[in-house]
């Protein structure tokens, strides 16, 4: 990750994204034990969970690296890395935190329902 073009000398690279996402998921489950689709909690722009999720990604788009220093945080979205349609109607698994990334609106719209093939 050292040579990743999204990491600059001006930004601190994140190393524990997976662990930080798990911690946030645990917090949500403790505070909202009946919630099954984590996406619905994180996606609310004015929520504390959304703010924490953005901080996990250093307020950077996971795809292009643009930050909220350059464009408004209103132009960022929580994206399903593997598109919802790939889950055949299983919103619970599609909305799990390990399938969510922070994306700028431009990248999210360009990605649409891109389907990743298995390697």
List the predicted regions and their residue ranges.
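Internal, well-ordered alpha/beta segment that forms a basic, Gly-enriched binding/recognition surface
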Residues: 108
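Conserved active-site neighborhood of enzyme catalytic/cofactor-binding cores
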Residues: 105
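Short, charged surface segments at domain edges that flank catalytic/cofactor-binding sites
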Residues: 2-66, 87-94
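Histidine-centered nuclease catalytic patch
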Residues: 66-102, 111-118
């Amino acid at each position: 990750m050292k040579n990743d073009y999204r990491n600059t000398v001006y930004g601190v690279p994140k190393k524990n994204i997976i662990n930080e996402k798990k911690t946030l998921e645990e917090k949500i489950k403790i505070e909202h034990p009946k919630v099954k689709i984590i996406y619905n909690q994180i996606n609310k722009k004015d929520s504390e969970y959304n703010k924490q999720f953005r901080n996990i990604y250093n307020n950077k788009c996971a795809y292009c690296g643009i930050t909220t220093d350059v464009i408004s945080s209103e132009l960022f979205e929580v994206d399903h890395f593997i598109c919802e349609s790939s889950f055949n109607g299983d919103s619970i698994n599609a909305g799990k935190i390990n399938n969510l990334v922070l994306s700028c609106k431009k990248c999210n719209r360009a990605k649409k329902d891109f389907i990743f093939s298995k390697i």
